[in-house]
Design a protein with these regions (language model features):
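Conserved active-site-adjacent core of cysteine acyl-enzyme catalytic domains
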Residues: 44-158
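Predominantly a core beta-strand signature of beta-propeller blades
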Residues: 9-10, 130
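Residue-level detector of conserved, well-ordered beta-strand and adjacent loop positions
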Residues: 4, 14, 31, 113, ...
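Short aromatic-glycine-(Arg/Gly/Cys) micro-motifs in beta-strand/loop hairpins
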Residues: 1-8, 28-29, 37-46
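A short, charged, amphipathic alpha-helix used as a generic interaction element across diverse proteins
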Residues: 13-31
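A structural signal for the beta-strand cores of small, secreted beta-rich domains
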Residues: 14, 38-40, 110
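Short, flexible active-site loop motifs that bind/organize anionic cofactors or intermediates
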Residues: 8-9, 80
Length: 158
């Protein structure tokens, strides 16, 4: 993962979360090896809602087991572990139409499928329902669970 900021290449990382954290301090961007934007500082829409019908079933199950996700999504895209990043940072992924699996407890998770000024929109893998949850409450919920966030970036075929 390539971090660009302050006019040039700043660093190369194997850990996407570390790349995002670095780019955030620089007001920069993170690109992958195929030059796709993985993350951009300050370039997210004010609100976004992703239709759950277009999300792969393995993501909707809310598993945060990286091996299982990689195996199931290998033809679809690359799994990106953003654990340790802030909720505000990972909302860029939603803005880019990428759902984010977020750990909420020891064995529980949700899929973040949207946000607006006041709420995140969370998909519950057990109830199979989407509901709004306050932004501050979401931040607290995810922080208490360790800020474990997993998303994926679709493969581009040139």
């Amino acid at each position: 993962y390539y971090v660009y900021g302050q006019g040039g290449l700043n660093g190369i990382y194997t850990d996407p979360a570390k790349a995002v954290l670095r780019a955030d301090t620089l007001g920069g961007v993170v690109l992958n090896r195929t030059q796709q934007y993985v993350w951009e500082r300050g370039n997210k829409k004010t609100k976004m809602q992703i239709d759950t019908e277009g999300i792969p079933e393995i993501v909707l199950q809310g598993t945060y087991d990286i091996k299982t996700l990689k195996k199931s999504l290998k033809k679809t895209g690359t799994v990106i572990d953003l654990s340790g990043c802030s909720l505000d940072s990972v909302l860029y992924e939603i803005s880019a139409q990428r759902p984010v699996i977020a750990k909420t407890g020891a064995d529980t998770s949700v899929v973040i499928v949207g946000y607006d000024e006041y709420n995140t929109w969370l998909y519950d893998p057990v109830k199979k329902e989407t509901y709004p949850y306050g932004m501050n409450d979401s931040t607290d919920l995810f922080q208490k669970a360790g800020n474990v966030f997993i998303t994926y970036i679709e493969t581009v075929n040139y």
